[in-house]
């Protein structure tokens, strides 16, 4: 299997958000889906299901429950039961709904920017309010939690922390020591943890993902974990995610509330998830090799040819968080690179105030496309 065997030749004209939002002359390295074709096992399973020709209301397969439980044990040494989960259309609806159930209007939710924009928006959708406790950028470009600031920010009406691990956009994988300290604070203040772990399959060598709920039975019962095969196997459009909670009283409350609000999981999403989790491990291993090569290529290119941009090599995800503040641009780097380089990135402002002057780059694409985009960015900087 060579690098190019993963790639979709052309996504333009396929109603892709990533490739359809901007003009034909713009290279899309923004929204977090890859340009890689899904695993052959997934495509074959979908073709077989479509050939059946009937697409009525689906049951939630026991096979998928068992596959998820086995996957959590095998990959993360986290023992859960098939009864500890429900299937929902997406991670974002999952944390929005959970936040709604845990808070009343005016109560507060902890978030840690720079972070995935829907996490910043979750509280406002329910009438609650955010308390921002920014991650601290270190001299090497990595990020750390200021635990003293986090605890000091907790108010009497703070109900939960929306946590992101692996972290989007900075690519941080939290250590056991960091997780244990975070958990200690949350348990002491009786905060529920809503943990977005959608990127947990996309871990590079040298790092290890630890589900925060796996630390103890006590924290498990105070945590709602959200995962999905969508980022891993590039099936976001099929709308299937997993919400895990060993507190069955809370899980049942979430499930009951979801009916009529979230809608059901897509039938083909269930089919794809089963095939991906059952038969996609070899494909995933190869994709991670490709992503690691792209990550290292991006880092080396920026270090050598774009020295005014700073990048810390991520521990996980296919996303690079680029500090462009030294460029001293008159406009946001997002607008600059879109107009001058014809490269679409994510605007750092969307990830919180501390994201101003940053962009997020998606390197889940062909090496050729990645090279072309970086060279266009280099040319735009040189000619400004």
Q: What are the residue ranges of the model-derived segments?
A:
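Conserved core segment of the aminotransferase class I/II
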Residues: 44, 217, 221-292, 382
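Conserved glycine-rich beta-strand-loop-beta hairpin in the small C-terminal domain of fold type I
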Residues: 274, 290-299, 311-324
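N-terminal small-domain helix-loop-helix segment of the aminotransferase-like
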Residues: 1-90, 97, 278, 384
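Helix C-cap/helix->beta junction micro-motif
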Residues: 126, 188-189, 219, 341, ...
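Conserved core of the PLP fold type I
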Residues: 55-184, 201-202, 209-214, 218
């Amino acid at each position: 299997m060579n690098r190019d065997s993963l790639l979709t030749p052309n996504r333009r004209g396929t109603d892709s958000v990533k490739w359809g939002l901007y003009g034909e002359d713009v290279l899309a390295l923004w929204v977090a889906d890859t340009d890689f074709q899904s695993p052959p096992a997934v495509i074959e399973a979908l073709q077989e299901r479509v050939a059946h020709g009937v697409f009525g209301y689906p049951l939630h397969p026991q096979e998928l429950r068992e596959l998820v439980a086995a996957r959590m044990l095998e990959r993360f040494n986290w023992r859960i039961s098939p009864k500890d989960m429900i299937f929902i259309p997406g991670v974002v609806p999952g944390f929005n709904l959970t936040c709604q159930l845990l808070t009343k209007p005016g109560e507060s939710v902890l978030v840690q920017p720079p972070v995935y924009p829907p996490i910043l928006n979750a509280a406002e959708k329910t009438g609650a309010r955010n308390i921002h406790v920014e991650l601290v950028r270190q001299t090497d470009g990595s990020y750390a939690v200021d635990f003293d600031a986090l605890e000091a920010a907790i108010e009497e009406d703070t109900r939960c922390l929306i946590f992101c691990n692996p972290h989007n956009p900075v690519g941080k994988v939290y250590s056991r020591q960091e997780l244990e300290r975070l958990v200690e604070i949350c348990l002491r203040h009786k905060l529920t943890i809503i943990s977005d772990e959608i990127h947990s399959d996309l871990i590079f060598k040298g790092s290890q993902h630890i589900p925060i709920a796996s630390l103890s039975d006590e924290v498990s019962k105070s945590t709602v974990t959200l995962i999905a095969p969508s980022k891993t196997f590039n099936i976001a459009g099929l709308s299937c995610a997993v919400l895990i909670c060993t507190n069955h009283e809370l899980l049942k409350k979430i499930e009951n509330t979801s009916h009529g609000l979230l809608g059901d999981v897509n039938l083909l999403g269930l089919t794809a998830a089963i095939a991906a989790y059952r038969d996609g491990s070899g494909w995933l291993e190869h994709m991670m090799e490709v992503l690691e090569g792209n990550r290292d290529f991006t880092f080396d290119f920026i270090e050598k040819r774009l020295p005014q941009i700073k990048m810390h090599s991520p521990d996980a995800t296919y996303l690079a968080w680029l500090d462009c503040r030294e460029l001293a641009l008159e406009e946001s780097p997002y607008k600059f690179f879109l107009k001058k380089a014809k490269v679409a990135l994510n605007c750092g402002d969307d990830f919180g105030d501390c994201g101003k002057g940053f962009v997020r780059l998606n390197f889940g694409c062909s090496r050729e496309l990645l090279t072309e985009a970086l060279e266009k960015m280099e040319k735009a900087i040189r000619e400004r």
